[in-house]
Design a protein with these regions (language model features):
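Glycine-rich phosphate-binding loop of ATP-grasp-fold ATP-dependent ligases
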Residues: 119-121, 140-178, 187-188, 195-202, ...
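Phosphate-binding core of ATP-grasp and ATP-grasp-like enzymes
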Residues: 178-187, 192-235, 243-264, 268-276, ...
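A conserved helix-loop-beta module that forms one wall/lid of the active-site cleft
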Residues: 86-158
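C-terminal active-site "lid" helix and adjoining low-complexity regulatory extension at the edge
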Residues: 18, 39, 230, 240, ...
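Short amphipathic alpha-helical signal-transduction/dimerization elements
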Residues: 253, 303-310, 314
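ATP-binding N-terminal substructure of ATP-dependent carboxylate-amine bond-forming enzymes
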Residues: 1-97, 102, 128, 306
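Long amphipathic alpha-helical segments used for membrane anchoring, targeting, substrate engagement
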Residues: 310-333
Length: 333
């Protein structure tokens, strides 16, 4: 029987997923709140609906009798996806796991409990509270929204760098307000700034096995906001450094407890140690997961994520998942 996949969001970043699922013989229902979303035209069925509404999407999913749901390259409806998986008994992350994977404070707590390396992090109460906490730091800091994706609202605050003027209290408060306005739950984290190169780690979790596909070197602009400008695969860093990044990412994924999904981890290296910035339980954006990873590794990450979602077991799926275990997995962590 033909599998039925619900794709939450149908923008330009979701088009490769919609097209790939159709190539795999899956019936695709694409949902987006924008009737002009470019991906809707490629689906077998297009639904214009508020994809952030759990009740609306639960109703649509039941009517469509879906076998799986995927929310690629975006986080706005992760809670919805988790709720659908729970209510309909589907493969993938739960609602609780979705919340943990989209709330940076809860994520940091999970990392700490799971011994996954990450920076010192404080959930602040106000700009004044954040400033007082910052005054106790012996390093520079980062202000970031507790709930948001990408680099929106993130800013470096300077305290100890001799090459720059320290951030004034007035400027600190302005940056805090920007982070607060960008946070979907109106809370802001103050974190230790990790000085060093930035990376992402592309992962597929399949039946409890955490499979690392590759490590991506990232190029960003300078402080204070760190917008991504480019990506390189495979990593140009040493094998030892790459293994440290992989190990940190695997520990982080296991700390979050997610299963049968793609993961996009972000990390930095400082003084030879890997630090996790965050992990998204989804395909990464900027065409890293949907295009670049396939080109550099030969592994179709989109197909693998879809297979994990709908649990499609056929010759194509087995071949793709077989590639994942070809020396890319890091067991025992």
């Amino acid at each position: 029987m033909q599998k039925r996949l619900l794709v939450l969001a149908a923008g330009i970043l979701q088009v490769p997923v919609i097209k790939k699922a159709k190539e795999m013989g899956i019936y695709v229902i694409a949902a987006d709140g924008d009737k002009n979303a470019v991906g809707l035209q490629y689906a077998d069925k297009a639904i214009v609906v508020n994809i952030t509404s759990e009740e609306d999407m639960l109703r649509e999913a039941r009517e469509e009798k879906i076998d799986g749901v995927i929310h690629p390259c975006s986080e706005v409806s992760m809670n919805v996806m988790g709720r659908l998986n729970e209510e309909l008994g589907l493969s993938g992350i739960t609602r609780e796991q979705a919340i943990r994977a989209t709330n940076k404070h809860l994520m940091r707590e999970a990392f700490e409990k799971g011994n996954a390396p990450s920076p010192k992090s404080i959930l602040t109460k106000s700009a004044e509270d954040a400033w007082e906490q910052f005054m106790t730091f012996e390093c520079d800091g980062i202000l970031k929204p507790s709930r948001n994706s990408g680099s929106r609202g993130i800013a470096k605050v300077i305290k100890t760098n001799p090459n720059f003027t320290n951030t004034s209290k007035e400027e600190f408060s302005k940056l805090y307000d920007i982070a607060l306005n960008e946070s979907r739950d109106k809370s802001v984290l103050l974190e230790q700034f990790i000085e060093g190169p930035e990376f992402s780690i592309e992962i597929i979790v399949w039946d409890g096995q955490v499979n690392v596909l590759t490590v991506t070197d990232k190029k960003t602009n300078e402080a204070p906001h760190f917008v991504e400008l480019g990506h390189n695969q495979p990593s140009c860093y040493s094998a030892e450094e790459v293994e440290k990044l992989k190990a940190a990412a695997v520990a982080g994924v296991k700390a979050l407890g997610v299963n049968n999904c793609a993961c996009h981890a972000e990390a930095k290296l400082q003084n030879g140690k890997a630090y996790l910035m965050e992990i998204g339980a989804r395909l990464g954006g900027d065409f890293i997961s949907t295009e670049l990873t396939h080109l550099s590794t030969g592994v179709d990450m989109v197909a693998a994520a879809i297979n994990a979602t709908v649990k499609q077991v056929d010759e194509t799926a087995e071949a793709e998942m077989g590639k994942l275990t070809g020396g890319l997995n890091i067991p025992g962590l």
